Design a protein with these regions (language model features):
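A non-catalytic alpha/beta surface segment that caps or lines the substrate-entry region
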Residues: 50, 54-178
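Second-shell loop/turn segments in exported
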Residues: 34-42, 56-67, 160-166, 196-208, ...
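Structural recognition of the beta-strand scaffold that forms the well-ordered cores
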Residues: 48-56, 87-89, 174-178, 188-192, ...
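N-terminal hydrophobic or amphipathic helices/low-complexity stretches enriched
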Residues: 24-72, 76-77, 82-89, 179-181, ...
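Bacterial N-terminal signal peptides
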Residues: 8-19
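Metal-dependent peptidase/peptidase-like ectodomains
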Residues: 237-350, 356-360, 367
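His/Asp/Glu-rich mid-to-C-terminal helical/loop segments that flank catalytic regions of hydrolases
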Residues: 369-420
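Alpha-helical metal-binding/catalytic segments enriched in His/Glu/Asp
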Residues: 175-177, 191-245, 405
């Protein structure tokens, strides 16, 4: 397995040396023949929004329900329609113990005060305010977070009815498709997002925004005139909200099959060697920290950015950090509206099961531990996570994350446009 890491690290070093290092210095290429710029230009805001809107017809897509299964079927059909016809499914069982206690708004309005009443040692009103997951530290005001479990919190009767079915234990599936490389089909980057949600809304941001992003990248990379030297897998995980069960099932079932040619001599690799895993989870909402009253701004903040995270405590922290900065350089060169920043506290997302096996990063709207964990997104797991909640400024942040991933992956897999 270590050979995979050596291959990936060598590829990242070569890429930085050949081009992304220059982009990181801010020297953007205006070359009209640049295939990466052409591919990035094929990402359109209205198309991204339409794909996301399509997902919301299935409500919150809560795992173990008909609406979730219907959404998996719809995603597979959409992938096939855009040319990613090699769809497959991972099947696994999810049989949790029954929940104890009542429903309602878990974590909201209960517990000790979140914010200190005393000034900081230097006399400031608010400063360090505890720790978050993934090794993060929280600063500034916090607001309570939690999962809404009361269907009556959803005021839209039609949506409430759509989301009324409760999960049942049993078999689960998730779908992926693969763009096969022309010269190195046995090497692969995995691009993922989770398609399930909860909270009795539409799971538009968490994680319809990431799912739509991955589907849009599948559309562009599988266009008839696009070739890649290496393979790309587009994976839409299930059961993220219950503990990363879908991505964990993928790792458990597929990691030992990496690089095996089947049948021998066929040139076919059902599970190419993993070179990197890139997750996308909550892409739209960077409105800043809550104020003393717990209120978050209605508007995207001027300093909004895409957060690229790796986990500094993982076995492959150095390689994952290098991958993160490849994506940062791609953003510097090709993103149109918002910058990107790199942080070391990736956590609580579907790249976690991969992070000790292959270089792994996560792209998102905020830092997961320091920001999301402190309540920066008031719609997280809430009935207000609706398509209509977000504006074009929000959708553009998601599109900029798509531009970043597309540009980085296009260079890592050596994408070309046939006929140019």
């Amino acid at each position: 397995m270590r050979s995979n890491v050596i291959i990936a690290a060598a590829g990242l070093a070569l890429l930085v040396g050949l081009g992304l290092g220059r982009a990181a210095a801010g020297q953007q290429s205006a070359d009209a023949d640049d295939p990466v710029r052409t591919l990035v230009s094929r990402l359109q805001l209205e198309q991204y929004k339409a794909t996301l809107k399509g997902l919301t017809r299935f409500g919150d897509r809560r795992q173990g329900t008909t609406r979730n299964r219907d959404a998996v079927d719809w995603i597979e059909a959409q992938l096939q329609a855009v040319g990613c016809t090699s769809t497959e499914r991972i099947t696994y069982n999810y049989d949790p113990q029954p929940r104890t206690g009542g429903g309602g708004r878990r974590g909201r309005g209960t517990g000790p005060p979140l914010n200190p009443t005393e000034p900081t040692p230097t006399g400031g009103r608010i400063g360090r305010n505890g720790n978050g997951p993934g090794g993060s530290s929280i600063f500034g005001y916090r607001r309570r977070t939690g999962v809404v479990r009361d269907p009556m919190a959803q005021l839209d009767e039609a949506l409430r009815a759509l989301n009324s079915e409760e999960p049942t234990n049993g078999e689960r599936t998730e779908v992926f498709c693969t763009k096969v490389g022309t010269t190195n089909p046995d090497e692969m980057y995995i691009i993922g997002a989770h398609m399930d949600g909860h909270g009795f809304g539409e799971a538009a941001n968490d994680d319809g925004s990431g799912t739509a992003l991955v589907m849009e990248l599948a559309r562009i990379f599988n266009a008839p005139d696009v070739q890649t030297a290496r393979s790309i897998r587009f994976a839409l995980w299930n059961n993220e909200e219950t503990g990363l069960n879908g991505s964990s099932a993928y790792v458990e079932q597929r990691r030992e099959r990496q690089g095996l040619e089947s049948p021998p001599g066929s040139g076919r690799y059902p599970e190419p060697r993993w070179l990197g895993m890139i997750q996308h989870d909550m892409m739209l909402f960077d409105h800043g920290a809550p104020g003393p009253d717990g209120v978050v701004s209605r508007d995207q903040r001027r300093e909004a950015d895409v957060n690229i995270e790796f986990q500094s405590s993982s076995d492959l922290a150095d390689e994952s950090r290098d991958l993160a900065f490849v994506f940062k350089a791609a953003s510097d060169a090709y993103a149109t509206d918002y910058p990107a920043m790199v942080g070391p506290h990736m956590t609580n997302t579907d790249s976690t099961p991969f992070m000790n096996i292959v270089p792994s990063i996560s792209l998102r709207e905020n830092e997961r531990g320091m920001h999301v964990g402190a309540g920066w997104d008031p719609h997280w797991h809430q009935p207000t996570d609706l398509y209509s909640t977000f504006t074009d400024d929000d959708f553009r942040l998601g599109l900029n994350a798509a531009q970043t991933t597309l540009a980085a992956i296009a260079q890592l897999v050596e994408a070309t446009i046939v006929g140019r």
